[in-house]
Amino acid sequence: MEKKVSAIPQPKTYGPLGNLPLIDKDKPTLSFIKIAEEYGPIFQIQTLSDTIIVVSGHELVAEVCDETRFDKSIEGALAKVRAFAGDGLFTSETHEPNWKKAHNILMPTFSQRAMKDYHAMMVDIAVQLVQKWARLNPNENVDVPEDMTRLTLDTIGLCGFNYRFNSFYRETPHPFITSMTRALDEAMHQLQRLDIEDKLMWRTKRQFQHDIQSMFSLVDNIIAERKSSGDQEENDLLSRMLNVPDPETGEKLDDENIRFQIITFLIAGHETTSGLLSFAIYFLLKNPDKLKKAYEEVDRVLTDPTPTYQQVMKLKYMRMILNESLRLWPTAPAFSLYAKEDTVIGGKYPIKKGEDRISVLIPQLHRDKDAWGDNVEEFQPERFEELDKVPHHAYKPFGNGQRACIGMQFALHEATLVMGMLLQHFELIDYQNYQLDVKQTLTLKPGDFKIRILPRKQTISHPTVLAPTEDKLKNDEIKQHVQKTPSIIGADNLSLLVLYGSDTGVAEGIARELADTASLEGVQTEVVALNDRIGSLPKEGAVLIVTSSYNGKPPSNAGQFVQWLEELKPDELKGVQYAVFGCGDHNWASTYQRIPRYIDEQMAQKGATRFSKRGEADASGDFEEQLEQWKQNMWSDAMKAFGLELNKNMEKERSTLSLQFVSRLGGSPLARTYEAVYASILENRELQSSSSDRSTRHIEVSLPEGATYKEGDHLGVLPVNSEKNINRILKRFGLNGKDQVILSASGRSINHIPLDSPVSLLALLSYSVEVQEAATRAQIREMVTFTACPPHKKELEALLEEGVYHEQILKKRISMLDLLEKYEACEIRFERFLELLPALKPRYYSISSSPLVAHNRLSITVGVVNAPAWSGEGTYEGVASNYLAQRHNKDEIICFIRTPQSNFELPKDPETPIIMVGPGTGIAPFRGFLQARRVQKQKGMNLGQAHLYFGCRHPEKDYLYRTELENDERDGLISLHTAFSRLEGHPKTYVQHLIKQDRINLISLLDNGAHLYICGDGSKMAPDVEDTLCQAYQEIHEVSEQEARNWLDRVQDEGRYGKDVWAGI
């Protein structure tokens, strides 16, 4: 159905001037905000040279921030800034070679870990600011933006290039600042002029060129001095730019591009941060209650004259203040985008490929009441107390996606440090009752903002011999503590790239474990999704690929890689050495291991060398043992292929996770991993009758603004472990759930556990790890290591034997916790136990509603797992289903929406016949389908035939949504076929039996283009239904069994067969 398009709103134009008279040339952003307040979340502005589409509503911003549809546009003021910033990171097009090259080279220098190295240098400059303020006479004014500009310029100069501008020792601004400010101002004003005006302003042009040459001269001297000094073990931005090649191309940056990068960092690295600091001070002075809280935190945390790195990281409220300051006045107020293809946003606004320039107006986005509430103009740092609740795509102070500000961590750490030190030493006074006047060049800052200060306590009034070694010494001590003798000689000369394709996180988890294992031996490792390494694979070192299949198709983060692999010519991957491991489920025999097998074959066909045989693990078999066996063989093969040797003197492995008890709070990273949001429970009711001994819940949740879904989508839920199991763990290890701890890891990337920040043991065990999965052999082997009691040690070792493990552990679902309670002689430490537990996985539920009925709410249908434990002891309760069953109205859950890669959506043509098979909770997605069909019928659309095959035990006990389904049949929406397996006086009947009865009609429908959908149990029901259909096709068309199988495969390949089943990885 063709989308109805609408014209984008536009203010009144003024002939050839367009909308220019509406724009204040000195404060264009404020003009845009005023227009947005009148015209809404999207409007267009006609300038002298082009038309700009300005977007500020968070739903529209979410669309234009989709990097598959839009990319950064270097237009307007940024295009003018290229005169002196060239193809630096900020002003280059994404497709320009130097952007990707510089991005790859410089990313490590802006990681959170790198901030530790910069911290002492940041303190060095911050001390100079404190000393300056401490020496002021009473009633002398402080020009806040001017001093913040001095501070931030000196900081980026020292940290980035080991160059001292010494701004605090000058009466006037450094010449670079003068030239830069004039050049930025001129770049912005060039946009406001007619061509004839621009040509006549020859003096301005001459000054512009002079300023550019002045900046070039300073930067070229910095580069020349570094080269002449031999780059004596510097490890800063300049050193990396001069010496480090791009890991993808092997090329280094040329001198001209280094010049552009330095200018980019000198501008972007200080202008935006100085504005942030100035706005933060302004907002604190205007909000005394927030200033009081900030002083309280600073006095509690900063107990030394100069803050340590760890102390700055504890300034949580200060970071919230900075985030809220950036919300109200983001110092980089906009970013521009263009569409990669003709498209439509907001369901009705057409955007032309490459022609239409879109500008995201960030200050107005940050004032979107639909996302932030009605109090958007109030300064409320508490909005950022729980980052998971910050509205998605409604907060963009650092830009978007891969083109977001690379220096975000640098800016926030510097600003937090400086604000902390200023409040530590000074009382801030708004002596003139300053009224905000926003000044704009390329960035925003308060204009003519002056304050006075009074000393709070003994300040740093004399030059301090800074000891940047404090944090470094602590780090060195930690490193010495965790260093161990490497078990493999030569591993430090090897590099390893681990690629994964994963929809549910299992394959990704294996990939990260492989990288961690190698990293602990000194191997240089990298872990990324398959789609993120399109275009090149390294010919040095090893490549490991871990992937699953989804109904025979690549996972969502692997499809592009598979397509790229197909298009390569023979021998293009010659020199690449690789191995593949596949995750799957043998119940889907026709597609089992299809994608891992295909990638393995394609890699070999394109010239790569397989250094170890492909491994397979079956989710319905002994998955863990198959994985362990493959890892053992693969590492052995890798040692032979890369000439490595085993170190006979290796130390016994110990935990890489360390734990420290503290008294502060922290949080969980899993919600951020899945980009999850909070959703409120609206309804939670039982679907089974009171006479049933089982439970199925109908649960409705409200969606936050901006969240969308369609029929056939999944709701991913991040569950919470039961209080009963958590208490068992706490009791076993003698711990108190209220205790706060800080966890730190050495040599591993443990992504699911909150590291380096305080978290309670209760929260840690509730939200981070799986505690009742069957114990793995690796866990049991570790228990053996920590068990001294000979009888217990022998019993544990026996569980590892072939057959015993499968019968006694897997089949009975005996967890590591069960074993620890049984074998009290095992003295494993809590942190090692925690490290061995896998990440708490989201549970996916088929959505059982249609957005056509209510776009801001959805429902799921949850079968509650609560039955006698297979071990014969007690009751087994499903983690997620019981958690959800116990939620009440207005309770919040953490969840996210995913679209499965399985053709599970209604046909585009509503007249296409559909066949739906969904016994039990498999009815869920079809309820959404039927809601959509009812709306389509109400709109007068003609509907094709629809057959629903539903099964349950008894019509009076577990006939889910019975009244709805019977009404749907009465109203002509479906033909309903029900199978009852526990009805007294009748044989057990399942859905496949009914399908067999209707086989002639169903095969005819499928032969004529009908769509087939199966939802439910993938281990038994779905394969039986497939077998029944293939047997029917074989009988009716008189073909072989293989030809019938090929027919069903073709139906799936044509996109007419969708499966949504519980089995598989």
From Swiss-Prot:
Identify the GO cellular component terms for this protein: cytosol
Indicate the segments forming the Flavodoxin-like domain, all copies: 496-635
Question: Superkingdom of this entry's organism?
Answer: Bacteria
The record lists heme as bound by: C405
Keyword field contains Phosphoprotein: no
**Protein name, entry field:** Bifunctional cytochrome P450/NADPH--P450 reductase
**Uppermost EC category:** oxidoreductase
**PANTHER family in UniProt:** NADPH--CYTOCHROME P450 REDUCTASE (PTHR19384:SF17), NITRIC OXIDE SYNTHASE-RELATED (PTHR19384)
